[in-house]
Protein backbone atom coordinates (compact mmCIF):
# COMPACT_ATOMS: atom_id res chain seq x y z
CA UNK A 1 0.00 0.00 0.00
CA UNK A 2 1.26 3.45 -0.89
CA UNK A 3 1.27 6.29 1.60
CA UNK A 4 0.80 9.89 0.51
CA UNK A 5 2.39 12.75 2.40
CA UNK A 6 0.06 15.74 2.53
CA UNK A 7 1.09 19.25 3.49
CA UNK A 8 -1.55 21.83 4.40
CA UNK A 9 -1.16 25.17 2.59
CA UNK A 10 -2.74 27.02 5.52
CA UNK A 11 -1.00 25.69 8.62
CA UNK A 12 1.86 23.64 7.06
CA UNK A 13 0.82 20.54 8.99
CA UNK A 14 2.12 17.32 7.41
CA UNK A 15 0.34 13.98 7.65
CA UNK A 16 0.05 10.67 5.85
CA UNK A 17 -2.88 8.91 4.24
CA UNK A 18 -3.17 5.66 2.37
CA UNK A 19 -3.49 6.27 -1.36
CA UNK A 20 -7.16 5.35 -1.61
CA UNK A 21 -8.52 6.19 1.82
CA UNK A 22 -11.94 7.78 1.46
CA UNK A 23 -11.51 11.41 2.49
CA UNK A 24 -13.57 12.82 -0.37
CA UNK A 25 -13.70 12.80 -4.14
CA UNK A 26 -10.84 11.28 -6.08
CA UNK A 27 -9.46 13.63 -8.72
CA UNK A 28 -8.26 12.66 -12.17
CA UNK A 29 -4.71 12.28 -10.85
CA UNK A 30 -5.83 9.80 -8.15
CA UNK A 31 -5.06 12.33 -5.43
CA UNK A 32 -7.60 12.22 -2.62
CA UNK A 33 -9.23 15.48 -1.61
CA UNK A 34 -8.39 15.58 2.07
CA UNK A 35 -9.11 17.93 4.91
CA UNK A 36 -6.35 19.00 7.27
CA UNK A 37 -6.92 17.36 10.68
CA UNK A 38 -5.40 20.40 12.40
CA UNK A 39 -7.12 23.42 10.84
CA UNK A 40 -9.86 21.78 8.77
CA UNK A 41 -9.02 23.41 5.44
CA UNK A 42 -9.23 21.43 2.22
CA UNK A 43 -6.30 22.92 0.28
CA UNK A 44 -3.62 20.27 0.50
CA UNK A 45 -0.72 19.22 -1.65
CA UNK A 46 0.90 15.82 -1.96
CA UNK A 47 4.64 16.15 -1.58
CA UNK A 48 5.62 12.54 -2.21
CA UNK A 49 4.53 8.92 -2.05
CA UNK A 50 6.18 6.44 0.26
CA UNK A 51 5.91 2.71 0.68
CA UNK A 52 4.09 1.73 3.83
CA UNK A 53 6.35 0.13 6.42
CA UNK A 54 5.13 -3.38 7.12
Curated annotation (Swiss-Prot):
Highest taxon listed in the record's lineage:
Viruses
Which UniProt key words apply to this protein? Early protein
Record's family? Belongs to the phi29likevirus gp16.6 family.
Protein name, per record: Gene product 16.6
**Organism, per UniProt?**
Bacillus phage phi29
Q: Which gene encodes it?
A: 16.6
Amino acid sequence: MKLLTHVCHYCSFSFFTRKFDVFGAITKKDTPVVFCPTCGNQSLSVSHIEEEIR
